Amino acid sequence: MNYSLCVNEIFDSIDGEGKKAGQLATFIRLCGCNLRCSYCDTAYAFNEGRHMDIADIIAQVSYPNVTLTGGEPLCQDIHALLEGLKGHSVNIETNGSMDIEPYFKYDHVWFTVDYN
């Protein structure tokens, strides 16, 4: 289990999609993606970022709603982060190409498939 992740940016905003649309959330944009779509609106997240300890990431969470985005957040081992975010509602924005079954054990996690 990894205790650090490659993070592109962490910021607060209004969630624009999914079941928490319109609510404030902390967005954690993780680095990396298994696809290289020509229309990607966050291609800068493919390689740009820095490794951060899980505790440092969690310390920057400002709201009960958290969105993990990318790139493709499932390209990294995010289990330790999800464990640390229990008590939050976590939306994972995924491109839909990776297996989500390993994450079904988390009651506080849900998914939005977004291919842009």
Predicted regions and their residues:
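Non-cysteine beta-strand/loop elements that form the S-adenosyl-L-methionine
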Residues: V109-N116
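Short secondary-structure boundary/capping segments within folded domains
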Residues: G16-K20, G32
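Conserved Radical SAM active-site core
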Residues: L5-F11, L24-C31, L35-H108
